[in-house]
UniProtKB/Swiss-Prot annotation:
Binding-site list for substrate: 47-50, 98, 103-105, 109
Pathway named in the protein's UniProt entry: Porphyrin-containing compound metabolism; protoporphyrin-IX biosynthesis; 5-aminolevulinate from L-glutamyl-tRNA(Glu): step 1/2
Pfam families given in the database record: GlutR_N, Shikimate_DH
SUPFAM superfamilies noted in UniProt: Glutamyl tRNA-reductase catalytic, N-terminal domain, Glutamyl tRNA-reductase dimerization domain, NAD(P)-binding Rossmann-fold domains
Chain sites annotated for binding NADP(+): 177-182
Catalysis performed (reactions): (S)-4-amino-5-oxopentanoate + tRNA(Glu) + NADP(+) = L-glutamyl-tRNA(Glu) + NADPH + H(+)
Matches recorded under InterPro entries: 4pyrrol_synth_GluRdtase (IPR000343), 4pyrrol_synth_GluRdtase_N (IPR015895), GluRdtase_CS (IPR018214), GluRdtase_dimer_dom_sf (IPR036453), GluRdtase_N_sf (IPR036343), NAD(P)-bd_dom_sf (IPR036291), Shikm_DH/Glu-tRNA_Rdtase (IPR006151)
Family: Belongs to the glutamyl-tRNA reductase family.
Protein name per Swiss-Prot or TrEMBL: Glutamyl-tRNA reductase 2
UniProt-annotated catalytic positions: 48
Organism (species): Pyrobaculum arsenaticum (strain DSM 13514 / JCM 11321 / PZ6)
Described function: Catalyzes the NADPH-dependent reduction of glutamyl-tRNA(Glu) to glutamate 1-semialdehyde (GSA).
């Protein structure tokens, strides 16, 4: 039984599309996951350099529908399946697919998207395991290699770039957005000792949270506050995802000298009468630092392949856990019922404990069977137990397509 075969991914990155196209498709996928996610497990990773949608057990019709949504904005998108889809996600988490090799921002963005989509119920079952393992790979790569030494991500590169024009130690700086990139920018700017730092976010609580960690001042992300920052600050960094420009004019008497646009799509209007730094301006700097990390990248690639080899066993273990979870829950429920009939809390607890002690060794054996490649046998046995204890008959989530 190949538990990776139901995995598929639709991939679009900075190599195939510009920031504006990625932004539009990212918004499209945000709506799409709310339609597909409740029916089919789905995970969407949208950053300034990529929009990637992963599905588990999707029908060809669902996959085609997803691709068509991409094609509303670009000519084509890559489709990856099975182990190749997992390999790509592992490489993304490791920073091997980034403009800046080994950047750490992507790992934070991956975890942020994962947490949000698990809470929403979209990323679940065996897809959840795949994404969890990708996060594990990302952390392992950064712990065991030196691939992330130096600039942590595009935010770090943009700070290096801006420091060519502005003395940051004497500058007032504003960061628009308090997500993974914005928070990273704030942390590094604070470490560099900027004269004054402001954090703006649509949710003031999130801005306050970042501000407390960095000694900054939190403000709401409103048009009035953005204009105020342009008047007061020397540098403004924009790291927000929006379909509208957050900066579309420079007010008279503004102090701002440089605006950095890390938004996807672009969040700063073209043609402004000041220096605007775009993602494309950072490409040369990214190449320079990436070249220094190539030896460490080889070590990271080896880790990716090692973890990829272990993925089938992890999926098998999770598949059996899902299959027996309902059995265990139903058995405990029956034990509690019998205990209540006895009219004694002690009897109820004893019945429940006895059932768990009887079933747990069986559950562990089923997991071992799955890990040793006998997934189908383990699932067959678990389904026999399902019928015996009277739980609703059926295969575990997302396995009906795996034959």
């Amino acid at each position: 039984m190949d538990l990776l075969s139901p995995l598929s991914a639709v991939i679009l990155t900075y190599r195939e599309a510009d920031a504006n196209a990625l932004g539009r498709i990212g918004e499209e996928m945000r709506r799409c996951i709310e339609v597909i996610g409740p029916k089919t497990p789905m995970f969407v990773l949208h950053t300034c350099h990529r929009v990637e949608a992963y599905l588990y057990g999707a029908s060809e019709e669902e996959l085609s529908s997803l691709v068509e949504r991409y094609k509303r904005h670009v000519e084509s998108a890559r489709i990856l399946r099975g182990i190749e889809a997992a390999r790509h996600l592992f490489r993304v988490a490791a920073g091997l697919e980034s403009m800046l090799l080994g950047e750490t921002d992507i790992l934070g963005q991956l975890e942020e998207a994962y947490d949000r989509q698990v809470r929403a119920g979209f990323t679940r079952g065996l897809l959840k395991t795949v994404v969890e393992r990708a996060v594990r790979v990302g952390k392992k790569v950064r712990t065991e290699t030196g691939i992330s030494r130096g600039p942590a991500g595009l935010g770090s590169l943009s700070i290096i770039y801006v420091s060519q024009f502005v003395d940051l130690k004497s500058a007032k700086v504003a960061v628009l957005g308090a997500g993974a990139v914005g928070a990273g920018l704030a942390k590094e700017l604070a470490e560099r000792g900027v004269a004054k730092l402001y954090i703006l976010n649509r949710t003031l609580e999130k801005a306050t949270e970042v501000a407390k960690k960095t000694g900054a001042e939190a403000r709401p992300l409103t048009r009035e506050e953005v204009e105020r920052c342009l008047l007061e600050c020397d540098v403004v960094f924009s790291a927000v995802h929006t379909l509208e420009y957050v900066i579309d004019m420079i007010p008279p008497g503004a102090s701002v000298k440089v605006v950095v646009d890390l938004g996807v799509p672009q969040s700063v209007a073209p043609g402004l009468p000041i220096k605007v730094v775009r993602l494309s301006d950072l490409a040369e700097l990214a190449q320079r630092y990436s070249a220094l990390r190539k030896e460490e990248a080889k070590k990271a690639e080896a880790i990716v392949e090692e973890e990829l080899e272990m993925l089938p066993k992890a999926l098998a273990k999770r598949a059996v856990e899902e299959a027996v979870a309902e059995v265990m829950a139903r058995a405990v429920e029956i034990a509690e019922e019998e205990g209540r009939r006895a009219g004694c809390e002690v009897a109820q607890l004893a019945a429940k404990t006895t059932v768990k002690r009887l079933l747990l060794p069986i559950v562990e054996e089923l997991k071992k069977m799955a890990e040793n490649g006998r997934v189908e046998h383990a699932l067959e046995v678990s389904q026999i137990f399902t019928r015996l204890v009277g739980a609703p008959h059926g295969e575990p989530q997302n396995l009906k397509t795996v034959k």
